[in-house]
C-alpha cells in the first residue's frame, strides 16, 4: 500500500493544527481498541490508520467537538 502523508489529508482538513489534533485523538482511540474504519488497518500503526481514515473522509474535525 502506498505511503500516506499529511498532504493527502489536507483536502479534508485544511488546518494543519486541527489535522494533527484529529489524527492524534483518533490514533489514541484506535490504540485503546476502537474499530478501524478502513480496510487492511491491522498491518499499520494507529497513526497511519488514523491518517488513512481522514484521507478517506471517515473522520473529520467533528472528532474534536465530540466527547471522548
From Swiss-Prot:
**What is known about its subunit structure?**
The RNAP catalytic core consists of 2 alpha, 1 beta, 1 beta' and 1 omega subunit. When a sigma factor is associated with the core the holoenzyme is formed, which can initiate transcription.
Any one Gene Ontology MF annotation carried by this entry is: DNA-directed RNA polymerase activity
Full protein name? DNA-directed RNA polymerase subunit omega
What biological processes does GO assign it? DNA-templated transcription
Q: Which InterPro entries match?
A: DNA-dir_RNA_pol_omega (IPR003716), Pol_omega/Rpo6/RPB6 (IPR006110), RPB6/omega-like_sf (IPR036161)
Q: Which HAMAP family match?
A: RNApol_bact_RpoZ
Q: Which SMART domains match?
A: RNA_pol_Rpb6
Q: Which PANTHER family match?
A: DNA-DIRECTED RNA POLYMERASE SUBUNIT OMEGA
Q: Catalysed reaction(s)?
A: RNA(n) + a ribonucleoside 5'-triphosphate = RNA(n+1) + diphosphate
Q: What does this protein do?
A: Promotes RNA polymerase assembly. Latches the N- and C-terminal regions of the beta' subunit thereby facilitating its interaction with the beta and alpha subunits.
Q: Which UniProt keywords apply?
A: DNA-directed RNA polymerase, Nucleotidyltransferase, Transcription, Transferase
Name the domain of life.
Bacteria
* Entry annotated with the keyword Oxidoreductase: no
One GO CC term, this protein: DNA-directed RNA polymerase complex
Q: What is its EC number?
A: 2.7.7.6
Q: Which organism is it from?
A: Neisseria meningitidis serogroup C (strain 053442)
- Coiled-coil positions: none
The UniProt similarity line reads: Belongs to the RNA polymerase subunit omega family.
Recorded hits in Gene3D superfamilies, A to Z, give: 3.90.940.10
Amino acid at each position: 500500500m502506498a505511503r500516506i502523508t499529511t498532504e493527502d489529508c489536507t483536502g479534508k482538513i485544511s488546518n494543519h493544527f486541527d489535522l494533527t489534533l484529529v489524527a492524534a485523538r483518533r490514533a489514541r482511540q484506535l490504540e485503546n481498541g476502537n474499530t478501524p474504519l478502513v480496510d487492511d488497518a491491522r498491518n499499520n500503526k494507529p497513526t497511519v490508520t488514523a491518517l488513512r481514515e481522514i484521507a478517506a473522509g471517515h473522520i473529520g474535525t467533528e472528532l474534536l467537538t465530540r466527547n471522548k
